[in-house]
A protein has these predicted regions:
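Surface-exposed amphipathic alpha-helical tracts and adjacent flexible/coil segments at the periphery
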Residues: 1-5, 14-35, 39-53, 62, ...
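Alpha-helix capping/helix-boundary segments
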Residues: 66-67
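Beta/alpha (TIM)-barrel catalytic core signal, keyed to glycine-rich beta->alpha loops juxtaposed to Asp/Glu
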Residues: 87
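Conserved nucleotide-cofactor-binding alpha/beta core module
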Residues: 91-92
């Protein structure tokens, strides 16, 4: 029920052990159930939420409002975070999340820095996406995979159609292009812009990782953690920190929609 069903996800037994392992080390565990559900699936999703609640998962990251309603009825003290898949991209959306009892809002990765500054004034913790792939469409709203491959991106089964080769044609004649990857966006990297996000009041950062290798995750998280520690000491970000994000396979970097 997560937006990354093809990742090497936890089973129930592994989840229980992971929660114990993390809590012994002072680390919180957030579980994603952040796809949309039809009527036949909602009870199964709720069962997963019950299991997470009973085994002390700290919060659920969710998208489906029907699931939110059911959890609020049955487990009112279970913390919920609004997933980036909810595509919260305006202040009204943040205020709705507050009224629904969310404890944190992960705003859309298409957000600008101006919006982030306003979002962080709304008296609810804001999480922003800072590193990883960006969508050629609107993340959480793309139907290209469903239309061409019968695989729903909003069910976590995106076929990555935007990453394929395409030709550009005009009047039935192919137009020369610098690349055949005409729809494939660059990867986002906001390492050098962390000071602006901290100043805005962002409470936590989101780094893509569940479909990546442990090597990629370790390098990327290490780079951003070292950057935060340097900023806390009023030190500039060293080339060594920047180079950490180039050790793993990635596309060319961009600041995405932030600036």
């Amino acid at each position: 029920f997560s937006a990354r069903p093809f990742a090497n996800n936890f089973n129930h037994e592994e989840l229980v052990e992971a929660v114990k392992y993390c809590h012994l080390r002072g680390v919180k565990v957030y579980m994603t159930i952040n796809t949309l559900f039809n009527e036949n699936e909602l009870e199964m999703a709720l069962n997963e939420a019950r299991f997470a609640y009973e085994h002390k998962v700290d919060a659920l990251i969710v998208q489906d409002l029907g699931l939110v309603y059911r959890i609020r009825q049955e487990m009112p003290d279970f913390d919920l975070h609004a997933s980036t898949q909810m595509h919260i991209h305006n202040i009204a959306g943040i205020n709705v999340c507050k009224k629904l009892g969310f404890k944190k809002v992960v705003i859309a990765r298409e957000s600008s820095l101006d919006f982030i500054n306003e979002a962080c004034k709304q008296d609810i913790p804001i999480e922003t996406f800072i590193h990883g792939a960006i969508c050629v469409s609107y993340s959480g709203q793309c139907l290209m995979s469903s239309a061409t491959k019968n695989r729903s991106a909003n069910k976590g089964a995106c076929a990555q159609c935007c990453r394929l080769r395409y030709g550009l044609y005009e009047n039935n004649k192919r137009v020369p292009t610098d690349t055949d990857y005409l729809l494939s966006p660059k990867d986002m990297s906001l390492l050098s812009d962390i000071p602006s996000l901290i100043e805005a009041g962002v409470s936590s950062f989101k780094i893509e990782g569940r479909m990546k290798s442990s090597y990629y995750v370790a390098n990327t998280v290490n780079a951003y953690r070292r950057a935060l520690e340097s900023l806390e000491k009023n030190l500039p970000l060293s080339d060594e920190i920047y180079n950490e994000t180039f050790k793993s396979s990635h596309r060319k970097y961009t600041t995405g929609f932030y600036f």
